[in-house]
Amino acid sequence: MHFENINLKTKNIMRQTLRDRNQHVIGYIDVEFSGRQCLRDSNNHVLGYYEPGRNQTVDSNYHVIGNGNLLTTLL
């Protein structure tokens, strides 16, 4: 698993690149300093969020998907 530090508009974010079995990029998980995670597709469109304080995954429209971190099910 590879993480890289990126600075998006002065936010400290760790980015994990998600790849398929052929090493093609299928998405990214950005982990904010607060612990909140944002799932983006390979075109950088937001697909959903994991809110660790509530232990819930929500889609890009903030509809609850379920309890726990279910981000990769949105890919």
Predicted segments, located by residue:
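Intrinsically disordered, low-complexity proline/glycine-rich segments
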Residues: 1-75
